[in-house]
Amino acid sequence: MDGGSGGPYTSRTAEEVFRDFRGRRAGMIKALTTDVEKFYQLCDPEKENLCLYGYPNETWEVTLPAEEVPPEIPEPALGINFARDGMNEKDWLALVAVHSDSWLLAVAFYFAARFGFDKEARRRLFNMINNLPTIFEVVTGAAKKQTKEKAPNSTNKPNKPSSKMQPRPESHSKAPKPPAPPKDDDESGDEYADEEEEERDNTLCGSCGTNDGKDEFWICCDSCERWYHGKCVKITPARAEHIKHYKCPDCGNKRARA
């Protein structure tokens, strides 16, 4: 994505900045997980200040920081290589992950500022970013742990939108967003219905980051357990009936690369 200290800026959307964020994030996760041995070797403490960069095309690089001042975009943490041999490897990787998360947010909202995002566009961008686990959560395994902890709380409430955090029966992932259960006469039933309504309103599409079209067809990814507008992932109700286990575009691409 273009962005620098000079020159005109063309209009960009929150979705475009999010795609840039997601690509950089994927590259950095790759460096700290599947390519970790190569990453470890490149971070030689005998070398100068090194940085971990993630790029929009889902690649990564360990290199020296940009020489230009001020830099074209915010720079990642300097000198990640210096602490490598003085820490436990897992702790060091977790530290790099934390700094990587901070850098990704800085870059995303740098673009948001330069492209003149208003309050609503910034909100959409943040919500889309916040739907993804942080690099730290992926590297330390906290993301999987959170999913497992949330699943038991939702097993008896299959209609709650928060069930996107747990595996759902096939019928739930192939149907429009489930309606809230009917209100009971007792007070506890009313509270539960209110909670259902609030959580349904807060459920965001994993692709466009909005909760528009509550009456439209939605589908849930059986891998990452996020909800999507059918139109955003090009899945119709008729086609969904023939899909046993649905994978969203992100999860499908990860499997192909693996």
Curated annotation (Swiss-Prot):
* Protein name as annotated: PHD finger protein ALFIN-LIKE 5
- Please list where the region (Disordered) is annotated: 143-205
GO CC terms, sorted: nucleus
Q: State the UniProt keywords alphabetically.
A: Chromatin regulator, Metal-binding, Nucleus, Transcription, Transcription regulation, Zinc, Zinc-finger
Query: What molecular function terms (GO) are annotated for this protein?
Result: histone binding; transcription cis-regulatory region binding; transcription coregulator activity; zinc ion binding
What the entry lists under SUPFAM superfamilies is as follows: FYVE/PHD zinc finger (SSF57903)
User: What's noted about domains in the record?
Assistant: The PHD-type zinc finger mediates the binding to H3K4me3.
